[in-house]
Amino acid sequence: FIPLFERNGNIIRLDEYVFRAVCRQQKEWQKQGQKLLPVSVNISRVSLYYSSVVEKYESIIRSFDLDSKYIQLEITESATIDNNEIFNLLEQFHTAGFKILLDDFGSGYSSLAALNRMHFDTIKLDKSLVDYIGDDNGEKLLNSITKLAQSFGMEITAEGVETVEQLMFLCNLDCDDIQGYYFSRPLPVKEYEECLKEACM
């Protein structure tokens, strides 16, 4: 349904709804005295062209009295292709205190130029790249990409990790964060809270 929502403009309202929902949940955890961890929220390329998008998201997070460091914004690499307007928007989001994550890196678009021009805090390696692990040339490619991003001062998150072989290889690359079914499938809030309690014990 995402392509349909992007065509009819409803994706803007959906993005805002999800952003508000995450802010509301973070605020609830804060009231409960839990240690807050950053939560990433996707923002579509259509929303990025919405007028006053930065001010809108700033206003929402202020309404919940939250620090913007607890909400990270993920944009897909397809939204960054040779676009000065997006470049300026990312700088505005950074000025507002948001961290910007480049999602789906390596999923089919040319992102190397974007790494050079745009200030991303983190790149998220797409599962299609992680699946190269076990292939000599694929592993060399992953090694080169991570070293390049790290040389720009960016953190690395690997997506779609499903095997211990993938986990060990990515740990050896000094990936900052690793996510995937190897650890857990997406969880409802209550189950996530239980897992978090167990991890902290």
Name each model-derived stretch:
Residues 10-86, 160:
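Catalytic core of bacterial c-di-GMP phosphodiesterases, primarily the EAL and HD-GYP domains
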Residues 44-51, 70-83, 96-201:
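EAL-family c-di-GMP phosphodiesterase catalytic domain
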Residues 57-67, 90, 116-119, 171:
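Acidic (Asp/Glu)-rich catalytic clusters
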Residues 58, 87-91, 142-146:
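Short amphipathic alpha-helical segments and helix-helix/interface helices
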